[in-house]
């Protein structure tokens, strides 16, 4: 991992601009809008043989920080920025310069050198944002809860964060989330309400909604989130993005403030399938078994060392064709809401259009009408409430030293007596969940009964795949558009099936609602589709997702508006800008400091 010790001693007394002989460029040299891993690397490779003129990692990171500084005040997606991101970029620049020179200071063959560099560091200089329930050693983990804002930073990076850093990524900071990852509105006592960049009257999905809104707004190339029921897929759907909820156990969940042992996962959110695959390579490339998350013991040998990008290259940049010839899709009819209204009709139209595209590309689409596939009924098997208290208690007690005054248990975190009245936020819809979680545990008889029912559900899903010889199941992530600010909850989502069975899911953009320039929705509201595969079949799943992505360019970026000024991507930033979350924009429907009706 790149740290300050990686730099030569002379770096301590000279600025990076003195070393490479460049200064603040007169014109912007890198625009972060819709940047991908490959586009960042192409920009860095241009003029690489000339230290005086080549693009630097610091300039790339500066461009993204400028994007955040300019547009985050409107959508409120960021909780905190990492003050070390620019110095890490400087380290990467110095490392690159050293790697390109031989003992006689003669530049090596550029293409071969760059290939070696990206092989060693596949995320070289890629800006990444993390959901604020994922540990980084230099930033507090708050999960959006004001009561945890004073907690000391964790002693270590989460394994997924360490993997990203070792691969050359630059961690820019932490994103807002629905507090404690318990809903999908992305409102929190510390971070306030995050707005959907496509329609600021709506929520960005959640609970990883800050990550989704940030990646959609080009605040980073990649985002990292978690998913307990919908939380990676909902923000991807609501923001026109791609996400991967991996098979439970494929990626270690250690170093993540938990909700559910049964249902939690960690995964990426990106603007293209390729970036999902690269990040998955990185996050699965370390220790094969993590004793801090014994679910990783489930990993089968055949997925060890897989290169998830290997089968994707042929589909990049090509639109149309019959790339899905013979692929069998099962369309879950029970996950559709056929009501004709302004919230559901756009979703149904987008799914109908997507099915037509799949068939035109040679796919076979089979309607699944089994009554078992009913999201509302399946939600009755959710086991979060049984596991939440014990998992949060263990995390908080393992995180904080004796001197810390931060809450050490779930009960103290939600104490209306011990805490200030604005130290936590529970939306009224969640009051019964919190009250139940405070007294429930995995020792409850009903917990065992639900686990048996989950096992039966998992077998039934496998039976559906086998009996119809399906490759994947598809359905809208949400049966309606993402809800408006102030809504009771993020209703209509279909993520519970994969959350309980542990099956992998890739979410892809499926379409948009109608544009409405008079209501300030110039791009329409995004609609996403889930593609579910069999356990450990991420390679197949990503390949199919890439072929769907290649059928037609669906993703359209939001049209961003700055609150104060537009970004200057050519300016020189000496220090990371300050970000202050807007805690005053919380809707009156969500009172602070309460979890029950008094």
How should each PLM-predicted stretch be described?
Residues 54-58, 74, 119, 124-126, ...:
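Loop/turn elements at helix/coil->beta-strand transitions in domains of secreted/extracellular proteins
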Residues 124-146, 323-336, 385-462, 509-528:
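Short helix-loop capping/hinge segments that flank enzyme active sites or metal/cofactor-binding pockets
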Residues 61, 90, 345-370, 391-403, ...:
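Acyltransferase
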Residues 120-266, 292-299, 332-334, 473-489:
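Short glycine/serine-rich loop/turn segments
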Residues 92-127, 275, 316-332:
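Immediate post-signal peptide segment of exported/extracytoplasmic ligand-binding proteins
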Residues 451-455, 459, 463-500:
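An extended, acidic, His-containing surface patch that forms the Zn2+-binding/catalytic region
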Residues 1-97, 104-108, 333, 337, ...:
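An N-terminal boundary/leader segment
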